[in-house]
Amino acid sequence: MKASELREKSVEELNAELLGLLREQFNLRMQHATGQLTQTNQLKLVRRNIARVKTIITSKAGA
């Protein structure tokens, strides 16, 4: 998801998005640990998306 799309969302929607991303990260980590994950780049993408959402939440809280 692009940062511009995230900036348009409310804080509540961003928190819901963050929760979904954290769950996805957990599932990907479990798949990676059991050797079922074939696209390991997904871990990196989800981690960066989490950082994007957290950054925007922080900037909205300060504004």
Curated annotation (Swiss-Prot):
Task: Spell out the Pfam families in the cross-references.
Answer: Ribosomal_L29
Q: Which InterPro entries match?
A: Ribosomal_protein_uL29, Ribosomal_uL29, Ribosomal_uL29_CS, Ribosomal_uL29_sf
One cellular component term (GO) for this entry is:
cytosolic large ribosomal subunit
Among Gene3D superfamilies, the record links this protein to:
1.10.287.310
One function term, GO molecular function aspect: structural constituent of ribosome
- Work out whether the entry's keyword set contains Ribosomal protein: yes
> Keywords in UniProt for this one?
Ribonucleoprotein, Ribosomal protein
Annotated SUPFAM superfamilies? Ribosomal protein L29 (L29p)
Q: Which GO annotations describe the biological process of this protein?
A: translation
Name the family. Belongs to the universal ribosomal protein uL29 family.
This one is known as: Large ribosomal subunit protein uL29
Provide the species name: Shewanella baltica (strain OS155 / ATCC BAA-1091)
Taxonomy of the source species = Bacteria, Pseudomonadati, Pseudomonadota, Gammaproteobacteria, Alteromonadales
Q: Which gene encodes it?
A: rpmC
